[in-house]
């Protein structure tokens, strides 16, 4: 199966491309390299012996999308491309709506024009807003507490409407919880450009000496230790979830919605301690004010994905932290420049 992977040079996209190749699929990557580096391609080749086709283009460039879909005889699309920082989205809402919402509409329009009717969308647990309770099932009410989450929710609503109007399409919405970890070889990992917005790359950059200390946003949440609780999922498990979605429902007409999480919640301080165990170092941190748009706790009920896709997260907290440290210690400055 030939699959266009938008944002395939990014953190989750690159790991998913490896799992797709292992499953016998052919990923074709389209990415504008806004938050990634072209050297990712060499790492993918090093790990699995195959160098995917790479197209440098923006998802808002319809002509480039149409050409990619046609020339490569694409059968399905996995759509990762988008901006993804909660804090930045509060400062730059228009950029988030343009990239994430408008970009998706341009992509779907290009798919419609070329007759490609299978889409897997990289959504997020942020669409649940501040949930009334945990664990979270797929039928929970959706809302948003920040423009990033709202952009994901708007895309979900657009795709839901589009699938109703085009019932022969297969559209899958994968609501991720908090991806962490790296490829077990240490060849690929999370390499944010600039100051990390996510917990694990920040912790690992402190441990490797790139940053002085970790800022823990909020220590007065109604949780076990006052810090935010999240469902951290290994990026390799998440990647397997995309492959399972393509294999099980990618050619089945309908709207398919799945949580991809572990069903367990860990606090920020628990993650710091687990990382300290993995790297054998202290990770200095300071407690600071809450971030706007953050919530107290959030974890998944992943049973629907298990029942319908046969998918279950299996990698442990020790693997999440150990694999992250292997990546960061092997690549203290992240991916090299091309």
What is the role of each PLM region?
Residues 1-182:
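N-terminal Rossmann-like NAD(P)+-binding domain of SDR-like oxidoreductases, especially those catalyzing
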Residues 38, 167, 178-198, 209-230:
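Short, flexible, glycine-rich and Lys/Arg-enriched loop motifs at helix boundaries
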Residues 57, 69, 96, 191-195, ...:
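Pocket-edge positions in alpha/beta enzyme catalytic cores
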Residues 83-86, 185, 308-311:
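General structural signal for alpha-helix termini and helix-helix connectors
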Residues 199-338:
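C-terminal substrate-binding subdomain of Rossmann-fold SDR/epimerase-dehydratase oxidoreductases
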